[in-house]
Amino acid sequence: MQDLRLILIVVGAIAIIALLLHGLWTSRKERSSLFRDRPVKRTKQERVETPIESLDEGVGEVRVRTSHPQEKPSFNHLDDDDDEVPVIQHAETKSAQVKTASRQAPFASVQTDYDDPLLGGLSAEQPPHDLSRDPLLGKADESYSQPQHAEPPHVEKPAHQVAPQQHVESQQEPVAPAPEAKPQKLKETVLVLHVAAHHGGVIGGEVLLQSVLQSGFQFGEMGIFHRHLSPAGSGPVLFSLANMVKPGSFDPDTMSDFSTPGVSMFMMVPSYGDANQNFKLMLQSAQRIADDVGGVVLDDERRMMTPQKLESYKARIREVLDANTIA
């Protein structure tokens, strides 16, 4: 315990000594800063007091004019003029005329010390604030008054511009040729293939139904079979299959008792997707059905299919697609 007390006493003494030293150091620092500022204050006071001490108590000439170089104007030049213009008169024996003349002298000397190109040749007797006689300001007023008269035409111009636009639109309405849409509708073609029995025979309905369903056809609208994008029957129709005999429809419930000389497959061009691929798929389906029912594939003129006829089908597809692309 005694050691702890000694330690605390020593620490407290050190802290007190440190505080005293810090206080002495700060007080000396403040004193040194005060001594440094005093010469500055004295010089400022001397500058303020020197003009009054250097003034001449006697009054000489009433009008004082000094010539200063005009090439390098500066603020010091103006300060010198201000120091020389006011004249303090301490002599009470001067007459009232001398006082009035001394009052007018600063204004005259300030106006005539140097020739200002902006002020022209104004003197103390000419009031510079008379702006009504200034030709420059008169022109400025006229220039400001002119846009007020020019504003109404600017407001009316949009009205004149709208009218031609409406007139142009009215002219373009009849120019839009409605017949251009008709050629696009005419640029369509129907590709037809037939599957017929050999030598005037007939195709049984039951065998035909099985082959048609296996080829991905689904019975649908107009009582005929349709080949959709998906064999399950979903998606757009790519091509269709109808009876070669009028009215061309089928009845799936009575297909077992049905027979026909052949069926017709047809597709529209342009169609969904690639027309060439759709035609290739239709040709493959026709060949498959022909093989299943024991028939043959015929062209749109009911003739035997030849390579030349296939090229003519492809040419028709290209012609329609190119025409629609140009349109």
Curated annotation (Swiss-Prot):
The keyword Transmembrane helix applies. The chain crosses the membrane at residues 6-26. It comes from the Bacteria. Residues 1-5 are periplasmic. GO terms for cellular component: cell division site; plasma membrane. It is found in: Cell inner membrane. SMART domains: ZipA_C. Keywords: Cell cycle, Cell division, Cell inner membrane, Cell membrane, Membrane, Transmembrane, Transmembrane helix. Residues 60-182 are annotated as: Disordered. Residues 60-71 have a biased composition (Basic and acidic residues). Residues 27-327 are cytoplasmic. Its main location: membrane. The keyword Cell membrane applies. InterPro entries: Cell_div_ZipA, ZipA_FtsZ-bd_C, ZipA_FtsZ-bd_C_sf. One of its GO terms (biological process) is FtsZ-dependent cytokinesis. Residues 94-103, 163-173 have a biased composition (Polar residues). It is a single-pass type I membrane protein. Essential cell division protein that stabilizes the FtsZ protofilaments by cross-linking them and that serves as a cytoplasmic membrane anchor for the Z ring. Also required for the recruitment to the septal ring of downstream cell division proteins. HAMAP family: ZipA. Belongs to the ZipA family. Interacts with FtsZ via their C-terminal domains. This is Cell division protein ZipA. The lineage of its organism: Bacteria, Pseudomonadati, Pseudomonadota, Gammaproteobacteria, Enterobacterales. The gene is zipA.
